[in-house]
């Protein structure tokens, strides 16, 4: 069972929290109906001050203080309800050390919409790709210049860090997480229940092939991103690596060390999994 820590920050957006809870509750319900052990333990995370004030608001969920010894497998940061993000971040500074501590302990972190501002405030997104609500992307980029902001992305996944854009992008990221923790079949079923358009993904997330982004080799990461972005037009791996500051042999060795496979096989897997995603999407549409 995976421990989910859903932060309820100051100025949180209720619809964002409701969507997160609804999806993960539905996953657990599906497992319960099939007499299977529940895969997810949903925990509400708040400050001691908030717990005293909102003691009955999240009835039915364990409410855990940031001062407890709780350890999450994944921390979830919902969207904010206000446009005054500077003031909101000031209110939520208390959460930053807790998020950092959870990450150091091995947790994954996922933010939804403008929740990316709190995530980025921890410094954990520095040097990583991230997205947020399109209307807030310029402010986000200027506030956190070390973050590689991708405003056109619905979802980003970089190592143990995940972000989503605004509105229905929340569901796109939730589906990714369901797939990661519960598998393709459950993820596709959840997508059908919530009428989520899988075709909005910019990468093949529904995959038995799971690329490794947790390494620290920038050159390998650069090749991975090039393959995933331009896999249709790539004819040979030599065309990708010709301008890189290392020999072909060295690059292939490093790439295989970090990803487990050589670049050409990585390219083939990306193409296969993209085709798989398109087929799964076609099947969902035909069953509607």
Positions of predicted regions on the chain:
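Basic/polar phosphate-binding segments, predominantly the helix-turn-helix DNA-binding elements
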Residues: 226-228, 234, 238-273
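Conserved anion/nucleotide-ligand pocket segment
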Residues: 152-153, 157-193
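Hydrophobic positions on the alpha-helical face of helix-turn-helix-like DNA-binding modules
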Residues: 240, 286-288
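A conserved active-site-flanking secondary-structure segment within enzyme catalytic domains
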Residues: 126-153
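Accessory alpha-helical/coil subdomains and C-terminal extensions
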Residues: 181-225, 233
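Basic, amphipathic alpha-helical hairpins
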Residues: 179-183, 220-236, 255, 259, ...
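N-terminal functional module of multi-domain proteins
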Residues: 2-120
């Amino acid at each position: 069972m995976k421990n989910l820590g859903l932060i309820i920050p100051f100025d949180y957006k209720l619809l964002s929290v409701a969507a997160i809870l609804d999806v993960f509750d539905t996953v657990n319900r599906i497992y319960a109906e099939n007499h299977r052990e529940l895969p997810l333990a949903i925990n509400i995370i708040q400050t001691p001050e908030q717990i005293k004030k909102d003691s009955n608001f999240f009835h039915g969920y364990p409410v855990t203080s940031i001062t407890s010894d709780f350890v999450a497998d994944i921390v979830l940061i919902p969207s904010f309800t206000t446009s005054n993000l500077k003031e909101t971040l000031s209110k939520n500074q208390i959460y930053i050390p807790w998020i950092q501590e959870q990450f150091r302990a091995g947790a994954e972190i996922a933010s939804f919409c403008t929740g990316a501002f709190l995530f980025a405030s921890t410094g954990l997104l520095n040097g990583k790709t991230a997205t947020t609500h399109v209307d807030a992307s310029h402010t986000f980029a200027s506030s956190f210049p070390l973050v590689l902001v991708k405003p056109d992305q619905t979802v980003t996944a970089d190592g143990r860090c995940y972000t989503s854009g605004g509105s229905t992008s929340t569901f796109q990221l939730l589906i990714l997480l369901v797939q990661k923790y519960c598998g393709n079949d459950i993820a596709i079923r959840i997508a059908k229940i919530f009428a989520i358009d899988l075709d909005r993904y910019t990468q093949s997330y529904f995959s038995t092939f799971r690329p490794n982004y947790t390494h620290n080799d920038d050159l390998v990461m650069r090749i991975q991103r090039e393959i995933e972005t331009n896999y249709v037009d790539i004819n040979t791996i030599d065309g990708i690596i010709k301008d890189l500051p290392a020999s072909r042999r060295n690059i292939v060795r490093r790439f295989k060390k970090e990803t487990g496979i050589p670049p050409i096989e990585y390219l083939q897997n990306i193409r296969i999994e993209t085709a798989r995603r398109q087929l799964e999407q076609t099947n969902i549409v035909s069953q509607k």
